[in-house]
Amino acid sequence: MFIVQYRQNTEQSNYLCTQRTRRLLTTTNTMLHFDTDYMEGAHPKIMQRLMETNLEHTVGYGSDEYSESARAKIREACNAPDALVQFLVGGTQTNATVIDALLHRHEGVLAAETAHINVHESGAVEHSGHKVLTLPSYDGKVSADDVRKYIDDYYADETYEHMVAPGILYITQPTEYGTIYSLHELEVLSDICHSRNIPLYLDGARLGYALASDEADFTLADIARLCDVFYIGGTKVGAMFGEAVVARDPKTLPHFFPLVKQHGALMAKGRMQGVQFKTLFTDNLYVDIAKHAVRLAMKLREAFVSKGYKIAVNSPTNQQFVVLPNETLDRLKAHATFELWGIRGEHETTVRFVTSWATSEEDVDAFIGLL
């Protein structure tokens, strides 16, 4: 472990911190990891429960007692006692399955041009026969005015039956850029969709980090109340794998179970997801994991700002986007992993740093010492 303290009170302490960090990294050849939040296995409490239950014999496909208990805990947290809760294996499978289940054959899905389903899911939605209908992105978010205009303009066109109909609105919380929709923004989008008979679907791959943000003025119950369907991400928030789809009204997703299987998203060993989500929703672990990651992300952000680096997006969650001179980027790459956000620029590049349950205070301090 790196025992490095980051102090801003004197130039001397900063210098000593930096020199010791570089010496430690050089002698141990240890890399610091900030590339994403699902590169390690699983939170120790989840691993412990998986090991403790490993030799138990239970029924498959999520019909076991652990999955039922996890569903009950999720319904309670969502204040939605009658909700459908279905576990799926991963985020792309979840999005493709839910969107296919919600849409008629002639419909497409409205989403920001930067949306994960439009950019980083290899055409999974299109593979099911549905088009992604893109809207302008504002730091990852869609605007209520753009959503309203798109739907209204579609039906105002005399030839609308010859075009792909907007069948649902897809948003993410937090967005691809780590930004979050406020409660008011969610309420307005929900009203627009429901007044036009269009379901609102929220991708919650990193939902825990949105809930843990200091800027969050909404709860999980608010999400369940305002969205027709959403999912609680496990893969990126401490679980080894798995996502939990929630539909407040089960009639919104009729025949969902066989559709999950058709899309290759149903696990025979469903208990594995039940154990994980039951653990995540016991003693507030889900939010505690996210709070830890967000706190360290904010510490990273403050260090970048104090060193004079430009913050590309005002993200209050565990993803931070920073503009780095290319020479700085290349120097840091020798000691840490992170992702280029887009194409490398001629002189400077936007870089993404991500924290998780596995990120330690020492990791962050060591990286700060390199700046």
Predicted features, each with a name:
Residues A101-V119, R148:
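Conserved PLP-anchoring active-site segment centered on the Schiff-base-forming lysine
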Residues G129-G167, I171-P174, Y181-V188:
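PLP-dependent aminotransferase-class I/II
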Residues H104-H106, M298-L371:
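Conserved C-terminal alpha-helix-loop-beta "cap" of PLP-dependent enzymes
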Residues Y181-S213:
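Catalytic PLP-binding core of fold-type I/II PLP enzymes
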Residues H43-G91, E113-N118, A124:
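Conserved N-terminal alpha-helix of the aminotransferase class I/II PLP-enzyme fold
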